Curated annotation (Swiss-Prot):
One of its GO terms (molecular function) is tRNA (guanine(37)-N1)-methyltransferase activity. It catalyses: guanosine(37) in tRNA + S-adenosyl-L-methionine = N(1)-methylguanosine(37) in tRNA + S-adenosyl-L-homocysteine + H(+). InterPro entries: Alpha/beta_knot_MTases, tRNA_m1G_MeTrfase_C_sf, tRNA_m1G_MeTrfase_TrmD, tRNA_m1G_MTases_N, tRNA_MeTrfase_TRMD/TRM10. Belongs to the RNA methyltransferase TrmD family. Homodimer. This is tRNA (guanine-N(1)-)-methyltransferase. Signal peptide: none annotated. The keyword tRNA processing applies. It comes from Bartonella bacilliformis (strain ATCC 35685 / KC583 / Herrer 020/F12,63). One of its GO terms (cellular component) is cytosol.
Amino acid sequence: MTFQAHVVTLYPEMFPGVLGHSLAGRALERGIWSLNTVQIRDFALDKHHSVDDTPAGGGAGMVMRADVLVAAIDHCPPDLPRILLSPRGRPFNQAHARSLASDRGVVLVCGRFEGVDERVLQARKLEEISIGDYILSGGETAALVLLDALVRLLPGVMGNQASGECESFENGLLEHPHYTRPPVFEGLEIPLVLTSGHHKAIADWRQEQAEMLTQKRRPDLYAIYNKNRRKT
């Protein structure tokens, strides 16, 4: 079954963008996933194709209109998860990516300007998702990030499934360091254990390195990992 990605945006020309290349691009060509963009301005109600208006109560910037944006959203299948990319949303993570990738598709709504009329979220039950604690010019870049995370999890996209299972976050830890030829580079050697041929020793080293990196760089993740490990 083809995974359906619907993107509601003012800039459909931004898609597929980088997703037209590499793993995601090949998967798109093979029909593993499909991409449909909906131009919000096509649903404007005036001759100027206006999609925004001044904020109620005053303030800076402009707000995307509920009537226009809802009409654009309603152009997408109603039975798919609907997501608004927003800096105030729930932080996006690998577990959320796996959950969304297991569905039949997703509708991504890309905000612009100062924000979106709150009634859009209420009327169409949009979930707000954030890709980080920073501000972007619009939701399109965030939508590309989210789609990249989803598409690579779809069956048949990654050539080596084990590769995906060993990546950062898949087991609650950051990924261990990687090495390849040459054996010595500018005086830096590949750790001897990796060339020993001792598979258990290699696995133990990688696990130890992953735990050390996570504890140092992401103590928040390490605390969760430790808590879950104690339960098992």
